[in-house]
């Protein structure tokens, strides 16, 4: 619909140039066509007249009147009026929305997919949890947001690569190995001799038991076997990392999250990528030595202070491998790189960007892009749930999936803006009521399936072509409200991709489900008249299709029965 209205407005501008209202050399402005906040202001509004007023040497409202008069007639536009200082409001005819139903039916699974990305490459990194324990609910929020964002970008025509970065080379891995070794030697977290910064969850005992039993972990085709020797710290380290990476992969698979690339921090050192990044920074002239340490002049690139890259003992600070890792993304040809992180990592953003800019390789400012999420509070029975017995210090993603469902967890973790703190109410997520948004949306999809089964049971033969031809009979407010929502879906997908905000899909699906449930309660679908019945079934099937398309972008199932 936006494309149609933009074309009409463009023809109107040409008419004003032809009759002298606008100078002949006036270029069409970059006007917007958008949905007003309230329906009273029409279905769409444009600011075109306000942008053209200066060229016409006219006040915006007067030019708006001239532009409205110059618009060509269209069967899809019922009325055009002017509001405020010169906004032009379009009220669409029912035929415009009825035609949209046909678009949904014809395009099916592809309805809502666009070409904004034009096949360009984007890398989306998310979760990137340290392989030191089970995934917690914060990782779950990162997984839900990142995976849905990747799906939305794919729907907008981007060539998406999903990436998981494993920090498998730091102090935390050493603490993990020491913790598993202590368990393997018979110690507990309360024993004297337990590592000072050791991990205390019950899962450490599970890893130690598997190691001592000589179990083999199949990690993406790479077999790692426990040597049973509690004194062999290096073997324990390899086994523990493989064991926990494998466990995280199983949890992510249950959450319907997968990746194209698993990138190991250790490979950056092994392949010389950290040293390569450091040498590029030195060669660029944006480093200096002081106090035996190597510093990056990151203040030249917006940081609040210069940063140590290499300490006096020769080891690198943690942000150096981060810079090296993102350099590999640039070298791998990503036009865009998007990283989903917890908000507690905010401080690293400027440093990584400064390091990339300092290399003077033509990497754009603001590359990579970041999506930051806030904390999640888990509630049950009105009280906060703080601990998991197995993890020892946090609520795990597996806990939530087992208590509710993967569908509910994905929905609730993505349904609000990432930068807002989130309360996950287990009781609400389990409720089979309209108060539970994922149930409410899924039930709309299942309800259509139920109506189609009922039609078959009653012996009605549904003729979709007949239904499409008879959509004009659906001109009541509730039918048109559903059609309006269906027409919005491609815009919502496009905007969600532009803003990197997949939560907008969830908001939209609730609104579509509400319009559908309202229509269903106010309109008998399986009526005796075949024309009306087929038209209503066609509207229901179109709604079912858009619900399924949107739920797929969120990684949530579209059940046929509930």
From Swiss-Prot:
- Molecular function terms, GO-annotated: arginine-tRNA ligase activity; ATP binding
Subcellular location per the Swiss-Prot or TrEMBL entry: Cytoplasm
CDD domains membership: ArgRS_core
**SMART domains membership:** Arg_tRNA_synt_N, DALR_1
Q: Which residues form a coiled coil?
A: none
Q: Could you give one GO CC term from the UniProt record?
A: cytoplasm
Q: Which PROSITE patterns match?
A: AA_TRNA_LIGASE_I
- Per the UniProt entry, the Enzyme Commission number(s) are 6.1.1.19
Q: Does the keyword Thylakoid apply?
A: no
> Where in this protein would one find the motif 'HIGH' region, according to its record?
129-139
Enzyme class, UniProt record, top EC level: ligase
InterPro entries assigned: aa-tRNA-synth_I_CS (IPR001412), Arg-tRNA-ligase (IPR001278), Arg-tRNA-synth_N (IPR005148), Arg-tRNA-synth_N_sf (IPR036695), ArgRS_core (IPR035684), DALR_anticod-bd (IPR008909), Rossmann-like_a/b/a_fold (IPR014729), tRNAsynth_Ia_anticodon-bd (IPR009080)
User: Which reactions does this protein catalyse?
Assistant: tRNA(Arg) + L-arginine + ATP = L-arginyl-tRNA(Arg) + AMP + diphosphate
Q: Which GO terms describe its biological process?
A: arginyl-tRNA aminoacylation
Enumerate the UniProt keywords alphabetically: Aminoacyl-tRNA synthetase, ATP-binding, Cytoplasm, Ligase, Nucleotide-binding, Protein biosynthesis
Chief localization: cytoplasm
The annotated subunit structure for this chain is:
Monomer.
What's the family? Answer: Belongs to the class-I aminoacyl-tRNA synthetase family.
The name of this protein is Arginine--tRNA ligase
Which species is this record about?
A: Xanthomonas euvesicatoria pv. vesicatoria (strain 85-10) (Xanthomonas campestris pv. vesicatoria)
